[in-house]
């Protein structure tokens, strides 16, 4: 079977790029499919994640829209970019004659309804629809897609006019080590240092609990445009010796077991892959009830604590509750291991195979 995956920029190191690359690799190596990844923006920069031998990669080399021009100029350039994108992508589709095309992210949604092909068209939603750029332009895609795949049941409710909507969560590799040390008074948070991840809120919450728990330390892993602002916030709150911005880890799954508590303050998520990773490593989680995914993964009082969005006082109280009890962390962490196993690749990938077999009929 010939499969095409679209992706906006294969050189970006993010959760969506990681999971798309893993799926392409698995389809090629384990099932023998002919897989092509079409990167819209990529030029000569290397792919952010390794590609299997059977996966081909081409770039449409669509230029980025300049940020320093006025609104009229931006809109004109945006139209030119989209027309160029449609033309170049159609040329690839005509040459490849795929059986299935997986469209991903915002530009994928814009491409889908205009692509002329006999292939089945599948749109993958990697972020909650209402928080996705250009989501108001998704209606043609909704009507044109053969299937829309969402990460959560909450996001699936956003698509009402599609022939078929299904829910397939992200998957993770089974960790080499999945026993956390619950005696350690160290908490971890992971994600891009960008506004949607809510690390500014987390730092404020940590200030509230710092005096009550002077022996606890918070490490934040990730990089992004907000790093300098977050570092300044840490310094202004005199938390330099209590919070560390650790940068990006090459293998975060080896890092989680060094901690006894996972924290997530996202304002919204597609699903929350770092939450799944932490659970699979036996870490209890304190999370905001972000849209969407928290309630799909965390059962309040079983494998973590869920707090209503942006309630910093309640979040700080939940942190104190977890930090004060090693027994609670151990109990919730053991339950988290069971939850994490549900998202191992071997337990999830069969749903993708089932979807492809259904589309072939």
Segments (PLM) and residue ranges:
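A short, well-ordered alpha-helix in the C-terminal region of glycosyltransferases
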Residues: 314, 321, 328-342, 351-354
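Donor nucleotide-sugar binding/catalytic pocket of nucleotide-sugar-dependent glycosyltransferases
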Residues: 126, 130, 143-177
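Conserved acidic donor-binding segment of nucleotide-sugar-dependent glycosyltransferases
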Residues: 289, 299-301, 305-312, 321-326
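Short hydrophobic beta-strand element within catalytic cores of glycosyltransferases
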Residues: 284-288
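Aromatic "clamp/platform" in nucleotide-sugar-dependent glycosyltransferases that forms part
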Residues: 248, 267
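Short His-centered aromatic/hydrophobic patch
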Residues: 85, 103-109
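N-terminal strand-loop element at the rim of the active site
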Residues: 5-13, 26-79
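A conserved mid-protein helix/loop that constitutes part of the nucleotide-sugar donor-binding site
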Residues: 14-22, 185, 192-208, 225-231, ...
